[in-house]
């Protein structure tokens, strides 16, 4: 069990002579910093003094897809293997997680053997982009995962499929 703690101190002058705008912005900044710390821990926490992150868990045999170190681009078959490795019990609510750079440079524009795109960028009801890969939502987590590069080193995790309800 881990707690995220944020210790804040204010001088007497600040606590007495402060503006409401300053107070609300201060609270928003603290909340954003805490959310980022939680996201970092969920994805790549070391497990020592913080939660063990998704990328630090021991992968079940057969659920890790290795990409050759000399690979300059992801292949359609790599993505298909990753989808196939996901146990069916997790299929309904699982999402792809990767950096925006990996998604746009490696996957957008990729087509299957019928020349149909495997990734889509749609604009939702709010006008914000909605990303998908094989019909599965893509969550961009670029601040917490490295992007795929042609010189990717061994054991570098640049994308994963996960059910965040777990």
Show where each model-derived region lies.
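Structured, hydrophobic secondary-structure cores that serve as assembly/anchoring elements
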Residues: 1-166
């Amino acid at each position: 069990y881990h707690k995220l703690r944020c210790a804040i101190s204010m001088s007497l002058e600040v606590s007495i002579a402060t503006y409401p705008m300053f107070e609300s912005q201060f609270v928003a900044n603290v909340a954003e910093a805490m959310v980022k710390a939680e996201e970092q821990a969920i994805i790549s926490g070391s497990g020592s003094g913080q939660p063990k992150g998704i990328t630090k868990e021991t992968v079940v045999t057969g659920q890790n897809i290795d990409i050759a170190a000399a690979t300059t681009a992801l292949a359609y078959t790599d993505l298909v293997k990753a989808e196939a490795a996901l146990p069916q019990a997790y299929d309904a609510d699982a999402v792809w997680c990767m950096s925006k750079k990996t998604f746009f440079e490696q996957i957008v524009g990729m087509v299957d053997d019928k020349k149909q795109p495997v990734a889509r960028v749609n604009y939702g009801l709010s006008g914000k982009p909605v990303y998908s890969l094989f019909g599965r939502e893509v969550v961009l987590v670029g601040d917490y995962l490295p992007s795929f590069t042609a010189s990717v080193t061994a054991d570098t995790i640049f994308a994963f499929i996960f059910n965040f309800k777990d």
